[in-house]
Amino acid sequence: MHTGQIIQLLAGFYDVLTEDHKIVRTRARGNFRNQKTSPLVGDMVDFKESENDTGYITKIHTRENELVRPPLANIDQAVIVTAATEPSFSANLLDRQLVALAEKHIEAILYFSKTDLLSPTEFQDLQKIAGYYQKIGYQVIFPISSQPDADLIELKESFKNQLTIFMGQTGAGKSTLLNRIDSKLNIATGEVSQALNRGKHTTRKVSLIPIEDGLVADTPGFSTYAVFEMADTQLKEYFIDFKKLSQNCRFRECLHLNEPGCAVKAAVEDGSVLSSRYANYEQFIELIRNQKPEYKRKGYQKKDRRKKK
């Protein structure tokens, strides 16, 4: 019996990286279908090797976390590639991504791409926004043309012993950035459609690539997230700046909406919290509250209303 981590799924085969850095091509046993589960890229698995050089996965280890889109497991950190322009910067999308990652216990690294395309005024405005996210505790990489390699050095230092994903709005430059990190990757890139201001999807498969003593996934770009599957009372826990300030709220269960003595609202009013952060928080609360019930819960079975013969 051997143990390793799935680094690629392609045409029904799972490539597993072993502890001695050997890659073994495997298939999943049929019993996983009976368990209503299947291996994901990033899974730690046990497998048996066979004589025809194709192994068989026998066990999937307990996952630390997982994403549905893209289908990945055991992610340590995510580099959110946020376009400064083309497509336009979206604080709403960035905050959605940060909440989604925090809910999955995935550390976030903010990378602002295409900063060289901004005017001096636009550059300064976005740099202030980036500075706020850095101040509240996020690792932020904001490329400066006078220091062309500083961003890559900082990124590479963060990869060691981590499973890292790259995510962000379509056309933000995830694949372009990975090509800069390691030219041998030769990942396809696409231009942004001028008509739709949306990038063409260029990444076709889910795989993990060994880089700087870590594993990096290049994942399909996407620009929206489903409504968060959480109670409205939970959302405040994933706004790290709000969480720190809430200790000074008059009420312990303050939702930072209409309650008197709210430290978060006071911070928004005096400018120490970005107004866009609070506006996004209010919008996300409404999205959660207006979410339709999910009836396909575990254990739920639709009644058969057909008449028995």
Curated annotation (Swiss-Prot):
Belongs to the TRAFAC class YlqF/YawG GTPase family. RsgA subfamily. One of its GO terms (molecular function) is GTPase activity. CDD domains: S1_YloQ_GTPase (cd04466), YjeQ_EngC (cd01854). Its main location: cytoplasm. Keywords: Cytoplasm, GTP-binding, Hydrolase, Metal-binding, Nucleotide-binding, Ribosome biogenesis, RNA-binding, rRNA-binding, Zinc. Residues 64-225 form the CP-type G domain. This is Small ribosomal subunit biogenesis GTPase RsgA. Monomer. Associates with 30S ribosomal subunit, binds 16S rRNA. One of several proteins that assist in the late maturation steps of the functional core of the 30S ribosomal subunit. Helps release RbfA from mature subunits. May play a role in the assembly of ribosomal proteins into the subunit. Circularly permuted GTPase that catalyzes slow GTP hydrolysis, GTPase activity is stimulated by the 30S ribosomal subunit. SUPFAM superfamilies: Nucleic acid-binding proteins, P-loop containing nucleoside triphosphate hydrolases. Its EC number is 3.6.1.-. The keyword Metal-binding applies. Binds 1 zinc ion per subunit. It comes from the Bacteria. GTP binds at residues 113-116, 168-176. PROSITE patterns: ENGC_GTPASE, G_CP. InterPro entries: G_CP_dom, NA-bd_OB-fold, P-loop_NTPase, Ribosome_biogen_GTPase_RsgA, RsgA_GTPase_dom, RsgA_N. It is an enzyme of class 3 (hydrolase). One of its GO terms (cellular component) is cytoplasm. GO terms for biological process: ribosomal small subunit biogenesis. Zn(2+) binds at residues 249, 254, 256, 262. It is found in: Cytoplasm.
